[in-house]
Amino acid sequence: MTEQLPKGYSPHLYNQDLGPQPQKWTWYNIFAFWMSDVHSVGGYVFAASLFALGLASWQVLIALLAGICIVQLIANLVAKPSQQAAVPYPVICRLAFGVFGANIPAVIRGLIAVAWYGIQTYLASSALIIVVLRFFPQMAVYAEPHFAGLSYLGWLGFLSLWVLQAAVFWAGMESIRRFIDWAGPVVYAVMFVLAGWIVWKAGWANISFTLSEKSLSGWQAFGQVIVATALVVSYFSGPTLNFGDFSRYCRSMRDVRRGNFWGLPVNFLAFSLVTVVIVSGTLPVFGEMLHDPIATVSRIDNSMAVLLGAFAFVTATIGINIVANFVSPAFDFANVAPSKISWRAGGMIAAVASIFITPWNLFNNPLMIHYTLDILAAFIGPLFGILLVDFYLIKKQKIDVDALFDDSPSGRYYFDGGVNWTAVKALLPATLVGVAITFTPALQGMANFAWFTGCFLGGLFFLVLARREQVRAPAPSVAG
């Protein structure tokens, strides 16, 4: 990959995809980004699950609002350095971890994204097969597991979605922006129509905003509200960590904050309310409560409605997979060897890897997920803490953009051999605490708060170590 290097930039740190980009995105593009992230089969199931915790509807709404407002605050904080420097998440990681040490947080996030990319694609393809069998029941013979644990029909569905997602990604960030700009509203339109149909069939009197037979009260209810709040924050932690991959394109932080407001508290609350109306109504309409939107659509006695509904939710899955699990590893893997791996090549590495991990086997083995994804996820909280403390408290919101691409020993972010060992020292113990919480039965009560624990400890350890070791901060003269 040959391209003109700006003066002083190292080919080991720079390619055009990682360098500063034109900033043309408006608040609506950020709003659409969050719509694509929220409007998915996974988001639908997650939103419905919050109303099945045994809480009164107003208690669930309090938890929803509290959790999503925390996410909004974090997203605003994470967005600023990337918007300020117009560079993606792995490049911003060089501030805290060093120009080469940044590969540690980048690869961690990339591996998590690869696994979830495969799982999301598999889940969407499985739901799509339900629709296919609705129209072609004779194909059920091809739905039995055959090769590598997946059926012929399963492979057809998985690879079809895989190719569709790869095609959208390959077209570039501008095409991705255009795709997510309309994908979110399309899903909303289908959901509103579906909710209206459900209410018409079930009757408003049969719609309940509580999806659980149990009912909590007193301190039990209060504790569950806190748990629900933590679950919301944890659910959004992945895409929020690499939100800079998108905020880098935004015209201003004012646009980012406005887009985050409409895309997070307003959008998530509206989506959750429509979701619970649909899920609640499936019981009187179909005789059982359905938590999968495509399964719900497939039960409608209208072929055109089934096709439109399936199209909308497949579109939603493509949207979330691209914004949360495709763009991220593309930048992350390109950051490892910029002169050899372009953004497109990084994305295709992730896409191909998602096949070889056979996500259907991973998803169907909860113990395997527990020992792989949960360990990787234990890194996310500490990474938030370290990156935010470094930018806001250590570096005082100052970034020397040119130094982010300088691998000379005198470079501002070169530290020790290109690695800031202070950040690594802070990351490891904070992560070990998260792993201990996840895998120690006696600490299971804290498992839902692992993100908060990791974020606090990662930030605290880094702050103490950085001040003790007097890590250099950029001078006031650099861009801020």
Name these PLM-found stretches.
Residues G42, A66-I74, I108-Q120, P185-W200, ...:
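Selective recognition of specific alpha-helical transmembrane segments in multi-pass small-molecule
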Residues T121, S125-R134, V186-E213, Y235-F236, ...:
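Hydrophobic alpha-helical segments and their helix-loop junctions in multi-pass secondary transporters
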Residues L133-W170, P185-L194, V225-F243, V266, ...:
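Transmembrane alpha-helical segments of multi-pass small-molecule transport proteins
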Residues A63-F97, R109-I112, W116-Y122, I278-T282, ...:
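Juxtamembrane transmembrane-helix boundary signature
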Residues D17, Q21, L383-V464, R468, ...:
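C-terminal membrane-solvent junction of multi-pass transporters and transport-like membrane proteins
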Residues I108, I119-S125, L156-I198, L211, ...:
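Membrane-interface loop-to-helix entry segments
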Residues W27-Y44, G157-L164, A195-A202, E213-I278, ...:
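Hydrophobic, membrane-embedded alpha-helices of multi-pass small-molecule transporters
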Residues M1-S57, Q72, M191-K201, L216-T229, ...:
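Membrane-interface "cap" regions at the ends of multi-pass membrane proteins
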